[in-house]
Protein backbone atom coordinates (compact mmCIF):
# COMPACT_ATOMS: atom_id res chain seq x y z
CA UNK A 1 0.00 0.00 0.00
CA UNK A 2 1.24 3.52 -0.86
CA UNK A 3 2.39 5.64 2.07
CA UNK A 4 2.05 9.34 2.78
CA UNK A 5 5.14 11.03 4.28
CA UNK A 6 4.84 14.34 6.13
CA UNK A 7 7.70 16.35 7.64
CA UNK A 8 8.45 19.01 10.29
CA UNK A 9 5.80 21.52 11.32
CA UNK A 10 3.16 19.98 9.05
CA UNK A 11 3.65 16.58 10.77
CA UNK A 12 3.39 18.04 14.27
CA UNK A 13 0.29 20.09 13.38
CA UNK A 14 -1.46 16.99 12.00
CA UNK A 15 -0.72 15.15 15.28
CA UNK A 16 -1.97 18.18 17.21
CA UNK A 17 -5.33 18.14 15.40
CA UNK A 18 -5.89 14.52 16.46
CA UNK A 19 -4.77 15.27 20.02
CA UNK A 20 -7.18 18.25 20.22
CA UNK A 21 -10.14 16.09 19.17
CA UNK A 22 -9.44 13.34 21.71
CA UNK A 23 -8.56 15.70 24.59
CA UNK A 24 -11.78 17.70 24.15
CA UNK A 25 -13.95 14.55 24.08
CA UNK A 26 -12.38 13.26 27.28
CA UNK A 27 -11.98 16.58 29.16
CA UNK A 28 -15.75 17.23 29.29
CA UNK A 29 -16.03 14.42 31.87
CA UNK A 30 -13.53 15.91 34.36
CA UNK A 31 -14.59 16.95 37.86
CA UNK A 32 -17.76 16.64 39.96
CA UNK A 33 -19.77 18.59 37.37
CA UNK A 34 -18.24 16.85 34.35
CA UNK A 35 -20.70 15.74 31.66
CA UNK A 36 -21.24 12.27 30.22
CA UNK A 37 -20.26 10.98 26.78
CA UNK A 38 -22.51 8.70 24.71
CA UNK A 39 -20.78 5.92 22.77
CA UNK A 40 -22.67 4.44 19.84
CA UNK A 41 -22.32 0.66 19.67
CA UNK A 42 -22.68 -1.41 16.49
CA UNK A 43 -24.62 -3.97 18.49
CA UNK A 44 -26.86 -3.26 21.45
CA UNK A 45 -27.78 -0.05 23.22
CA UNK A 46 -25.52 3.02 23.24
CA UNK A 47 -23.27 3.33 26.29
CA UNK A 48 -23.34 6.47 28.45
CA UNK A 49 -20.09 6.82 30.36
CA UNK A 50 -17.88 9.14 32.33
CA UNK A 51 -14.58 7.23 32.13
CA UNK A 52 -11.68 8.83 30.23
CA UNK A 53 -9.83 5.72 29.06
CA UNK A 54 -12.99 4.01 27.77
CA UNK A 55 -13.86 7.08 25.68
CA UNK A 56 -10.27 7.30 24.40
CA UNK A 57 -10.36 3.66 23.26
CA UNK A 58 -13.48 4.31 21.17
CA UNK A 59 -12.15 7.23 19.11
CA UNK A 60 -10.94 6.41 15.59
CA UNK A 61 -10.55 9.18 12.99
CA UNK A 62 -10.77 8.91 9.22
CA UNK A 63 -7.49 10.79 8.65
CA UNK A 64 -4.63 8.31 9.37
CA UNK A 65 -2.21 11.05 10.50
CA UNK A 66 -4.66 12.67 12.92
CA UNK A 67 -5.48 9.17 14.16
CA UNK A 68 -1.79 8.77 15.09
CA UNK A 69 -2.16 11.79 17.41
CA UNK A 70 -5.23 10.19 18.96
CA UNK A 71 -3.31 6.93 19.51
CA UNK A 72 -0.44 8.75 21.26
CA UNK A 73 -2.67 10.50 23.77
CA UNK A 74 -4.72 7.33 24.21
CA UNK A 75 -1.48 5.69 25.32
CA UNK A 76 -1.03 8.28 28.11
CA UNK A 77 -4.52 7.41 29.35
CA UNK A 78 -4.18 3.63 29.11
CA UNK A 79 -0.70 3.54 30.71
CA UNK A 80 -2.06 5.57 33.64
CA UNK A 81 -5.00 3.18 33.82
CA UNK A 82 -2.64 0.16 33.87
CA UNK A 83 -0.43 1.65 36.59
CA UNK A 84 -2.98 3.28 38.89
CA UNK A 85 -6.41 2.31 37.56
CA UNK A 86 -7.73 5.88 37.64
CA UNK A 87 -6.71 9.44 36.67
CA UNK A 88 -6.92 8.81 32.93
CA UNK A 89 -8.79 12.04 32.16
CA UNK A 90 -6.25 14.08 34.16
CA UNK A 91 -3.39 12.43 32.23
CA UNK A 92 -5.09 13.30 28.92
CA UNK A 93 -5.69 16.94 29.89
CA UNK A 94 -2.08 17.30 31.12
CA UNK A 95 -0.59 15.72 27.99
CA UNK A 96 -2.73 17.97 25.77
CA UNK A 97 -1.64 21.13 27.64
CA UNK A 98 2.06 20.13 27.45
CA UNK A 99 1.85 19.35 23.72
CA UNK A 100 0.11 22.68 22.93
CA UNK A 101 2.65 24.74 24.89
CA UNK A 102 5.59 22.72 23.55
CA UNK A 103 4.57 22.98 19.89
CA UNK A 104 4.39 26.77 20.17
CA UNK A 105 8.01 26.79 21.34
CA UNK A 106 9.18 24.33 18.67
CA UNK A 107 7.46 26.45 15.98
CA UNK A 108 9.32 29.49 17.34
CA UNK A 109 12.63 27.69 16.77
CA UNK A 110 13.40 25.97 20.10
CA UNK A 111 15.35 22.69 19.99
CA UNK A 112 12.87 19.88 20.71
CA UNK A 113 15.49 17.50 22.18
CA UNK A 114 16.65 20.06 24.76
CA UNK A 115 13.03 20.95 25.56
CA UNK A 116 12.35 17.24 26.23
CA UNK A 117 15.32 17.12 28.63
CA UNK A 118 13.86 20.06 30.52
CA UNK A 119 10.42 18.39 30.63
CA UNK A 120 11.97 15.16 31.97
CA UNK A 121 13.97 16.97 34.68
CA UNK A 122 10.91 18.96 35.78
CA UNK A 123 8.82 15.76 35.94
CA UNK A 124 11.44 14.00 38.06
CA UNK A 125 11.47 16.97 40.48
CA UNK A 126 7.65 16.97 40.70
CA UNK A 127 7.45 13.21 41.35
CA UNK A 128 9.71 13.75 44.39
CA UNK A 129 7.50 16.60 45.60
CA UNK A 130 4.29 14.55 45.21
CA UNK A 131 5.91 11.80 47.30
CA UNK A 132 6.97 14.38 49.93
CA UNK A 133 3.45 15.78 50.26
CA UNK A 134 1.54 12.49 50.29
CA UNK A 135 -0.03 11.35 53.57
CA UNK A 136 -0.39 7.65 54.37
CA UNK A 137 -3.95 6.36 54.75
CA UNK A 138 -4.74 5.58 58.35
CA UNK A 139 -8.47 4.84 58.56
CA UNK A 140 -11.47 3.74 56.56
CA UNK A 141 -12.80 7.34 56.37
CA UNK A 142 -9.90 8.29 54.07
CA UNK A 143 -10.51 5.14 52.00
CA UNK A 144 -14.20 6.08 51.67
CA UNK A 145 -13.24 9.63 50.60
CA UNK A 146 -10.91 8.30 47.90
CA UNK A 147 -13.55 5.92 46.58
CA UNK A 148 -16.22 8.64 46.60
CA UNK A 149 -14.13 11.07 44.51
CA UNK A 150 -13.02 8.37 42.03
CA UNK A 151 -16.63 7.24 41.55
CA UNK A 152 -17.68 10.76 40.56
CA UNK A 153 -18.80 11.94 44.03
CA UNK A 154 -20.93 8.89 44.81
CA UNK A 155 -20.73 8.57 48.61
CA UNK A 156 -22.58 5.26 48.70
CA UNK A 157 -19.86 3.69 46.52
CA UNK A 158 -17.09 5.14 48.71
CA UNK A 159 -18.67 3.72 51.88
CA UNK A 160 -19.19 0.32 50.26
CA UNK A 161 -15.54 0.02 49.19
CA UNK A 162 -14.30 1.11 52.64
CA UNK A 163 -16.62 -1.52 54.12
CA UNK A 164 -15.30 -4.19 51.72
CA UNK A 165 -11.69 -3.33 52.58
CA UNK A 166 -12.49 -3.59 56.30
CA UNK A 167 -13.80 -7.12 55.73
CA UNK A 168 -11.13 -8.56 53.42
CA UNK A 169 -8.15 -6.40 54.46
CA UNK A 170 -6.28 -3.76 52.46
CA UNK A 171 -4.59 -6.41 50.33
CA UNK A 172 -7.84 -8.32 49.90
CA UNK A 173 -9.68 -9.09 46.68
CA UNK A 174 -12.71 -7.01 45.69
CA UNK A 175 -14.61 -8.41 42.72
CA UNK A 176 -17.45 -6.84 40.68
CA UNK A 177 -20.54 -8.67 39.45
CA UNK A 178 -23.68 -7.53 37.68
CA UNK A 179 -26.46 -7.77 40.26
CA UNK A 180 -30.05 -8.82 39.77
CA UNK A 181 -31.70 -6.00 41.75
CA UNK A 182 -31.89 -2.18 41.66
CA UNK A 183 -29.55 -1.74 44.63
CA UNK A 184 -25.81 -2.30 44.82
CA UNK A 185 -24.96 -4.91 47.47
CA UNK A 186 -21.81 -6.17 49.16
CA UNK A 187 -21.22 -9.83 49.97
CA UNK A 188 -18.12 -11.52 51.40
CA UNK A 189 -17.57 -15.10 50.28
CA UNK A 190 -14.78 -17.70 50.23
CA UNK A 191 -12.32 -17.26 47.39
CA UNK A 192 -8.76 -16.43 46.43
CA UNK A 193 -6.69 -14.62 43.83
CA UNK A 194 -3.27 -15.68 42.53
CA UNK A 195 -0.77 -14.11 40.13
CA UNK A 196 -1.11 -16.25 37.04
CA UNK A 197 -3.31 -15.45 34.04
CA UNK A 198 -4.61 -17.47 31.11
CA UNK A 199 -2.04 -19.43 29.05
CA UNK A 200 -3.55 -18.23 25.75
CA UNK A 201 -5.45 -14.97 25.04
CA UNK A 202 -7.89 -17.05 22.94
CA UNK A 203 -9.50 -18.13 26.22
CA UNK A 204 -10.83 -14.57 26.82
CA UNK A 205 -14.64 -14.42 26.81
CA UNK A 206 -14.74 -10.60 26.88
CA UNK A 207 -12.37 -9.44 24.13
CA UNK A 208 -12.83 -5.74 24.93
CA UNK A 209 -11.49 -6.16 28.47
CA UNK A 210 -9.37 -9.20 27.55
CA UNK A 211 -10.61 -11.37 30.40
CA UNK A 212 -12.28 -14.75 30.73
CA UNK A 213 -15.32 -14.85 33.02
CA UNK A 214 -16.74 -18.33 33.69
CA UNK A 215 -19.86 -18.78 35.80
CA UNK A 216 -20.31 -21.95 37.88
CA UNK A 217 -17.38 -23.76 36.28
CA UNK A 218 -15.83 -27.14 37.02
CA UNK A 219 -12.18 -26.77 38.10
CA UNK A 220 -9.57 -29.39 37.19
CA UNK A 221 -6.49 -29.17 39.45
CA UNK A 222 -3.35 -31.13 38.62
CA UNK A 223 0.36 -30.81 39.40
CA UNK A 224 1.52 -32.45 36.16
CA UNK A 225 2.36 -31.09 32.72
CA UNK A 226 -0.38 -31.87 30.24
CA UNK A 227 1.39 -32.81 27.02
CA UNK A 228 -1.15 -34.99 25.24
CA UNK A 229 -4.77 -34.12 24.73
CA UNK A 230 -5.63 -37.85 25.07
CA UNK A 231 -5.09 -37.47 28.84
CA UNK A 232 -7.88 -34.89 28.96
CA UNK A 233 -10.37 -36.51 26.57
CA UNK A 234 -12.30 -38.62 29.18
CA UNK A 235 -12.90 -35.67 31.49
CA UNK A 236 -13.68 -33.27 28.60
CA UNK A 237 -16.33 -35.65 27.28
CA UNK A 238 -17.99 -35.83 30.70
CA UNK A 239 -18.02 -32.03 31.04
CA UNK A 240 -19.34 -31.46 27.49
CA UNK A 241 -22.44 -33.48 28.49
CA UNK A 242 -23.13 -31.16 31.45
CA UNK A 243 -22.82 -27.98 29.35
CA UNK A 244 -20.84 -26.26 32.12
CA UNK A 245 -17.55 -24.38 31.62
CA UNK A 246 -14.19 -25.84 32.69
CA UNK A 247 -11.07 -24.20 34.13
CA UNK A 248 -7.84 -26.23 34.07
CA UNK A 249 -5.13 -25.24 36.55
CA UNK A 250 -1.99 -27.29 35.80
CA UNK A 251 1.80 -27.03 35.97
CA UNK A 252 1.77 -26.35 32.22
CA UNK A 253 -0.11 -27.27 29.05
CA UNK A 254 2.02 -28.06 26.04
CA UNK A 255 1.35 -26.98 22.47
CA UNK A 256 -0.69 -29.89 21.13
CA UNK A 257 -3.05 -30.09 24.12
CA UNK A 258 -3.33 -26.28 24.27
CA UNK A 259 -4.18 -26.02 20.56
CA UNK A 260 -6.96 -28.61 20.96
CA UNK A 261 -8.46 -26.72 23.91
CA UNK A 262 -8.32 -23.41 22.00
CA UNK A 263 -10.01 -24.92 18.92
CA UNK A 264 -12.80 -26.40 21.07
CA UNK A 265 -13.25 -23.06 22.80
CA UNK A 266 -13.41 -21.09 19.52
CA UNK A 267 -15.84 -23.54 17.92
CA UNK A 268 -18.12 -23.34 20.92
CA UNK A 269 -17.85 -27.07 21.67
CA UNK A 270 -16.64 -26.43 25.22
CA UNK A 271 -16.24 -23.23 27.23
CA UNK A 272 -12.76 -23.84 28.65
CA UNK A 273 -9.84 -21.80 30.02
CA UNK A 274 -6.39 -22.93 31.15
CA UNK A 275 -4.10 -21.36 33.73
CA UNK A 276 -0.60 -22.27 34.92
CA UNK A 277 -0.46 -23.13 38.61
CA UNK A 278 1.22 -20.49 40.83
CA UNK A 279 4.53 -21.06 42.66
CA UNK A 280 6.97 -23.91 42.07
CA UNK A 281 8.04 -27.23 43.61
CA UNK A 282 6.40 -28.24 46.87
CA UNK A 283 4.92 -24.77 47.32
CA UNK A 284 3.01 -25.11 44.05
CA UNK A 285 1.57 -28.40 45.23
CA UNK A 286 0.53 -26.90 48.57
CA UNK A 287 -1.23 -23.99 46.82
CA UNK A 288 -3.05 -26.40 44.50
CA UNK A 289 -4.18 -28.36 47.58
CA UNK A 290 -5.46 -25.09 49.10
CA UNK A 291 -7.47 -24.49 45.91
CA UNK A 292 -8.81 -28.06 46.05
CA UNK A 293 -10.09 -27.45 49.60
CA UNK A 294 -11.58 -24.09 48.58
CA UNK A 295 -13.41 -25.50 45.54
CA UNK A 296 -14.43 -28.79 47.16
CA UNK A 297 -12.43 -30.86 44.67
CA UNK A 298 -9.35 -33.07 44.64
CA UNK A 299 -5.83 -32.38 43.44
CA UNK A 300 -5.14 -34.95 40.72
CA UNK A 301 -1.58 -36.02 41.47
CA UNK A 302 0.25 -39.27 40.89
CA UNK A 303 1.54 -39.06 44.50
CA UNK A 304 -2.02 -39.88 45.58
CA UNK A 305 -2.40 -42.53 42.86
CA UNK A 306 -4.71 -40.36 40.75
CA UNK A 307 -4.27 -40.07 37.00
CA UNK A 308 -5.78 -37.54 34.62
CA UNK A 309 -7.20 -40.15 32.28
CA UNK A 310 -9.16 -41.69 35.20
CA UNK A 311 -10.52 -38.36 36.50
CA UNK A 312 -14.27 -38.15 37.13
CA UNK A 313 -16.59 -35.17 37.63
CA UNK A 314 -16.67 -35.90 41.40
CA UNK A 315 -12.92 -35.19 41.61
CA UNK A 316 -13.28 -31.73 40.04
CA UNK A 317 -13.74 -28.60 42.10
CA UNK A 318 -16.60 -26.15 41.56
CA UNK A 319 -16.89 -22.41 42.02
CA UNK A 320 -19.46 -19.66 41.72
CA UNK A 321 -17.38 -17.68 39.25
CA UNK A 322 -13.80 -17.46 37.99
CA UNK A 323 -12.35 -14.32 36.41
CA UNK A 324 -9.04 -14.64 34.54
CA UNK A 325 -7.07 -11.85 32.90
CA UNK A 326 -3.55 -11.90 31.47
CA UNK A 327 -1.95 -11.55 34.92
CA UNK A 328 -4.28 -12.81 37.64
CA UNK A 329 -6.96 -15.40 38.36
CA UNK A 330 -9.77 -14.80 40.89
CA UNK A 331 -11.77 -17.75 42.19
CA UNK A 332 -15.07 -17.00 43.93
CA UNK A 333 -16.24 -20.14 45.75
CA UNK A 334 -19.08 -20.61 48.21
CA UNK A 335 -20.57 -22.90 50.78
CA UNK A 336 -17.31 -24.48 51.87
CA UNK A 337 -16.49 -22.52 54.99
CA UNK A 338 -15.92 -25.50 57.30
CA UNK A 339 -13.25 -27.14 55.11
CA UNK A 340 -11.52 -23.78 54.49
CA UNK A 341 -11.38 -23.04 58.24
CA UNK A 342 -9.83 -26.42 59.07
CA UNK A 343 -7.26 -25.96 56.26
CA UNK A 344 -6.41 -22.52 57.74
CA UNK A 345 -5.90 -24.10 61.19
CA UNK A 346 -3.56 -26.65 59.60
CA UNK A 347 -1.47 -23.85 57.99
CA UNK A 348 -1.33 -22.00 61.35
CA UNK A 349 0.03 -25.16 63.02
CA UNK A 350 2.72 -25.45 60.34
CA UNK A 351 3.67 -21.82 60.98
CA UNK A 352 4.12 -22.51 64.69
CA UNK A 353 6.31 -25.54 63.98
CA UNK A 354 8.68 -24.06 61.38
CA UNK A 355 11.92 -22.27 62.32
CA UNK A 356 12.61 -20.82 58.87
CA UNK A 357 11.47 -17.19 58.52
CA UNK A 358 11.16 -17.66 54.74
CA UNK A 359 8.83 -20.64 55.16
CA UNK A 360 6.85 -18.72 57.77
CA UNK A 361 6.42 -15.81 55.35
CA UNK A 362 5.23 -18.09 52.54
CA UNK A 363 2.80 -19.89 54.88
CA UNK A 364 1.50 -16.49 56.00
CA UNK A 365 0.89 -15.59 52.33
CA UNK A 366 -1.05 -18.83 51.78
CA UNK A 367 -3.10 -18.23 54.91
CA UNK A 368 -3.95 -14.66 53.86
CA UNK A 369 -5.02 -15.84 50.39
CA UNK A 370 -7.20 -18.61 51.78
CA UNK A 371 -8.66 -16.89 54.85
CA UNK A 372 -9.09 -13.42 53.34
CA UNK A 373 -11.95 -14.42 51.12
CA UNK A 374 -13.32 -12.26 48.32
CA UNK A 375 -15.60 -9.25 48.67
CA UNK A 376 -18.15 -9.33 45.84
CA UNK A 377 -19.92 -6.07 44.98
CA UNK A 378 -23.12 -6.78 43.06
CA UNK A 379 -23.81 -3.73 40.93
CA UNK A 380 -27.49 -2.83 40.78
CA UNK A 381 -29.21 -0.37 38.41
CA UNK A 382 -32.53 0.24 36.66
CA UNK A 383 -31.19 -0.20 33.11
CA UNK A 384 -28.26 -1.98 31.51
CA UNK A 385 -26.81 1.36 30.30
CA UNK A 386 -26.76 2.71 33.87
CA UNK A 387 -25.29 -0.56 35.15
CA UNK A 388 -22.35 -0.39 32.73
CA UNK A 389 -21.60 3.21 33.75
CA UNK A 390 -21.87 2.30 37.44
CA UNK A 391 -19.57 -0.70 36.96
CA UNK A 392 -16.87 1.48 35.35
CA UNK A 393 -17.14 4.03 38.18
CA UNK A 394 -16.88 1.27 40.79
CA UNK A 395 -13.85 -0.16 39.04
CA UNK A 396 -12.16 3.27 39.12
CA UNK A 397 -13.05 3.66 42.78
CA UNK A 398 -11.61 0.23 43.73
CA UNK A 399 -8.38 0.97 41.84
CA UNK A 400 -8.10 4.45 43.38
CA UNK A 401 -8.48 3.15 46.93
CA UNK A 402 -5.86 0.43 46.34
CA UNK A 403 -3.48 3.05 44.88
CA UNK A 404 -4.13 5.26 47.92
CA UNK A 405 -3.25 2.42 50.30
CA UNK A 406 0.02 1.88 48.38
CA UNK A 407 1.40 5.44 48.13
CA UNK A 408 -0.85 7.62 50.29
CA UNK A 409 -3.09 10.56 49.38
CA UNK A 410 -2.67 14.20 48.32
CA UNK A 411 -5.20 17.08 48.08
CA UNK A 412 -7.51 16.38 45.11
CA UNK A 413 -9.38 18.38 42.50
CA UNK A 414 -6.22 19.37 40.59
CA UNK A 415 -5.03 21.26 43.69
CA UNK A 416 -1.73 19.41 44.26
CA UNK A 417 -0.44 20.05 40.72
CA UNK A 418 -1.55 23.71 40.82
CA UNK A 419 0.31 24.29 44.13
CA UNK A 420 3.43 22.59 42.75
CA UNK A 421 3.59 25.02 39.78
CA UNK A 422 5.22 27.96 41.68
CA UNK A 423 7.53 25.52 43.55
CA UNK A 424 8.67 24.06 40.20
CA UNK A 425 9.22 27.57 38.76
CA UNK A 426 11.43 28.55 41.68
CA UNK A 427 13.50 25.33 41.39
CA UNK A 428 13.81 25.56 37.58
CA UNK A 429 14.92 29.22 37.64
CA UNK A 430 17.64 28.29 40.14
CA UNK A 431 18.93 25.07 38.52
CA UNK A 432 18.13 25.06 34.77
CA UNK A 433 19.00 27.43 31.95
CA UNK A 434 18.40 28.01 28.23
CA UNK A 435 16.00 25.68 26.45
CA UNK A 436 15.93 23.18 29.35
CA UNK A 437 14.40 25.97 31.43
CA UNK A 438 11.82 26.55 28.68
CA UNK A 439 11.00 22.80 28.85
CA UNK A 440 10.45 23.05 32.63
CA UNK A 441 8.30 26.17 32.08
CA UNK A 442 6.12 24.18 29.64
CA UNK A 443 5.43 21.65 32.44
CA UNK A 444 4.85 24.47 34.94
CA UNK A 445 2.30 26.16 32.65
CA UNK A 446 0.48 22.83 32.14
CA UNK A 447 0.13 21.94 35.83
CA UNK A 448 -2.93 24.16 36.31
CA UNK A 449 -4.74 22.64 33.27
CA UNK A 450 -6.68 19.93 35.21
CA UNK A 451 -7.85 22.45 37.86
CA UNK A 452 -8.85 24.97 35.17
CA UNK A 453 -10.83 22.33 33.32
CA UNK A 454 -12.60 21.14 36.50
CA UNK A 455 -13.58 24.77 37.22
CA UNK A 456 -14.71 25.40 33.62
CA UNK A 457 -16.85 22.24 33.62
CA UNK A 458 -18.52 23.64 36.76
CA UNK A 459 -19.23 26.96 34.98
CA UNK A 460 -16.48 29.05 36.66
CA UNK A 461 -13.55 30.99 35.21
CA UNK A 462 -10.67 28.48 35.21
CA UNK A 463 -7.77 30.95 34.91
CA UNK A 464 -8.99 33.12 37.82
CA UNK A 465 -9.57 30.10 40.07
CA UNK A 466 -6.14 28.61 39.27
CA UNK A 467 -4.42 31.89 40.26
CA UNK A 468 -6.47 32.12 43.48
CA UNK A 469 -5.61 28.53 44.46
CA UNK A 470 -1.86 29.10 43.87
CA UNK A 471 -1.88 31.93 46.43
CA UNK A 472 -3.47 29.76 49.17
CA UNK A 473 -1.84 27.18 51.53
CA UNK A 474 -0.96 23.75 50.03
CA UNK A 475 -4.04 21.96 51.38
CA UNK A 476 -6.53 24.59 50.20
CA UNK A 477 -8.26 24.26 46.85
CA UNK A 478 -11.45 24.83 44.90
CA UNK A 479 -14.46 22.62 45.59
CA UNK A 480 -16.16 22.62 42.17
CA UNK A 481 -19.27 20.91 43.58
CA UNK A 482 -20.07 23.89 45.87
CA UNK A 483 -18.04 26.65 44.16
CA UNK A 484 -16.10 27.43 47.38
CA UNK A 485 -12.43 27.46 48.43
CA UNK A 486 -11.94 24.84 51.16
CA UNK A 487 -9.33 22.76 52.98
CA UNK A 488 -9.38 19.77 50.60
CA UNK A 489 -8.43 17.12 53.18
CA UNK A 490 -11.15 18.21 55.62
CA UNK A 491 -13.70 18.34 52.79
CA UNK A 492 -12.73 14.78 51.80
CA UNK A 493 -11.52 15.81 48.32
CA UNK A 494 -8.39 13.67 48.02
CA UNK A 495 -6.56 11.85 45.22
CA UNK A 496 -4.19 8.88 45.54
CA UNK A 497 -0.59 10.11 45.15
CA UNK A 498 0.04 7.20 42.76
CA UNK A 499 -2.72 8.40 40.40
CA UNK A 500 -1.39 11.98 40.33
CA UNK A 501 2.20 10.76 39.84
CA UNK A 502 1.36 8.25 37.07
CA UNK A 503 -0.77 10.78 35.19
CA UNK A 504 2.01 13.36 35.26
CA UNK A 505 4.76 10.91 34.23
CA UNK A 506 2.77 9.47 31.31
CA UNK A 507 1.64 12.90 30.09
CA UNK A 508 5.24 14.19 30.12
CA UNK A 509 6.46 11.07 28.33
CA UNK A 510 3.93 11.39 25.48
CA UNK A 511 4.42 15.18 25.20
CA UNK A 512 8.19 14.64 24.86
CA UNK A 513 7.61 12.09 22.09
CA UNK A 514 5.25 14.38 20.13
CA UNK A 515 7.61 17.38 20.36
CA UNK A 516 10.56 15.38 19.04
CA UNK A 517 8.56 14.07 16.04
CA UNK A 518 10.04 15.26 12.74
CA UNK A 519 8.39 12.95 10.22
CA UNK A 520 5.26 10.79 9.96
CA UNK A 521 4.78 7.85 7.62
CA UNK A 522 1.13 6.79 7.30
CA UNK A 523 -1.11 4.87 4.91
CA UNK A 524 -2.69 6.79 2.06
CA UNK A 525 -6.48 7.01 2.41
CA UNK A 526 -8.09 4.44 0.12
CA UNK A 527 -9.98 5.91 -2.82
CA UNK A 528 -13.61 4.90 -2.70
CA UNK A 529 -14.70 3.62 -6.10
CA UNK A 530 -17.86 5.30 -7.35
CA UNK A 531 -20.82 2.98 -7.75
CA UNK A 532 -21.68 2.06 -11.37
CA UNK A 533 -24.81 3.65 -12.82
CA UNK A 534 -27.85 1.42 -12.81
CA UNK A 535 -29.52 0.01 -15.93
CA UNK A 536 -32.68 1.74 -17.21
CA UNK A 537 -35.50 1.14 -14.82
CA UNK A 538 -33.00 -0.13 -12.13
CA UNK A 539 -32.52 3.13 -10.26
CA UNK A 540 -29.85 4.69 -12.52
CA UNK A 541 -32.29 6.51 -14.80
CA UNK A 542 -35.54 7.55 -13.27
CA UNK A 543 -38.69 7.22 -15.31
CA UNK A 544 -41.43 9.36 -13.94
UniProtKB/Swiss-Prot annotation:
Gene3D superfamilies: GroEL (3.50.7.10), GroEL-like equatorial domain (1.10.560.10), TCP-1-like chaperonin intermediate domain (3.30.260.10). Pfam families: Cpn60_TCP1. ATP binds at residues 29-32, 86-90, 413, 479-481, 495. Its EC number is 5.6.1.7. It is an enzyme of class 5 (isomerase). Keywords: ATP-binding, Chaperone, Cytoplasm, Isomerase, Nucleotide-binding. Its main location: cytoplasm. It comes from the Bacteria. It is found in: Cytoplasm. One of its GO terms (biological process) is protein refolding. The keyword ATP-binding applies. It catalyses: ATP + H2O + a folded polypeptide = ADP + phosphate + an unfolded polypeptide. Together with its co-chaperonin GroES, plays an essential role in assisting protein folding. The GroEL-GroES system forms a nano-cage that allows encapsulation of the non-native substrate proteins and provides a physical environment optimized to promote and accelerate protein folding. PANTHER family: 60 KDA HEAT SHOCK PROTEIN, MITOCHONDRIAL (PTHR45633). Belongs to the chaperonin (HSP60) family. This is Chaperonin GroEL 2.
Amino acid sequence: MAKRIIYNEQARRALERGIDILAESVAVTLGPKGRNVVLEKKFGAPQIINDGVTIAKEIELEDHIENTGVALIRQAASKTNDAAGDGTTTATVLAHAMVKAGLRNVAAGANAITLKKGIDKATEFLVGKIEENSKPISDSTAIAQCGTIAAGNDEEVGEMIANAMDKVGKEGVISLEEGKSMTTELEVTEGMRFDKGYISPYFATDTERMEAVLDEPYILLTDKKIALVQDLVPVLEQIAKTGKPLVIIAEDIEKEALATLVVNRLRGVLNVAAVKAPGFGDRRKAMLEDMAVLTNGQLITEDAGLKLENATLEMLGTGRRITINKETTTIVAEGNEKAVNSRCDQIKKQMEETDSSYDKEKLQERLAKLAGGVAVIKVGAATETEMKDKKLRLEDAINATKAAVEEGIVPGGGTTLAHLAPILKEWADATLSGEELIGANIVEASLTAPLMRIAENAGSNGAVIAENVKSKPFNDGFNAATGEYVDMSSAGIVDPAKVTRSGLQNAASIAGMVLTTECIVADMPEKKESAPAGAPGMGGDFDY
